Amino acid sequence: MKKDIHPKAVPTKIIYQGKVVMETLSTRPEIHVDVWSGVHPFWTGEERFVDTEGRVDKFNKRFGDSYRNKKK
């Protein structure tokens, strides 16, 4: 077996809205998340509207009609 081929695992802080919500091991020292199980509606049982743009909406907002006109 080869030695030293695996990445080094370090203590990692999972950060949600500027607060540390969990600590684990990973190859990164910090991971910033938008949603985690402590606030996700599926796990909390509350119903709420998550206001996020989809990939297509972000693309259209960024490039708009200019991309569609170039394809034709």
Swiss-Prot record:
Part of the 50S ribosomal subunit. Transmembrane segments: none annotated. It holds the Pfam family Ribosomal_L31. This is Large ribosomal subunit protein bL31. The keyword RNA-binding applies. Binds the 23S rRNA. One of its GO terms (cellular component) is ribonucleoprotein complex. The gene is rpmE. One of its GO terms (biological process) is translation. Belongs to the bacterial ribosomal protein bL31 family. Type A subfamily. Coiled coil: none annotated. Keywords: Ribonucleoprotein, Ribosomal protein, RNA-binding, rRNA-binding. GO terms for molecular function: rRNA binding; structural constituent of ribosome. SUPFAM superfamilies: L28p-like.
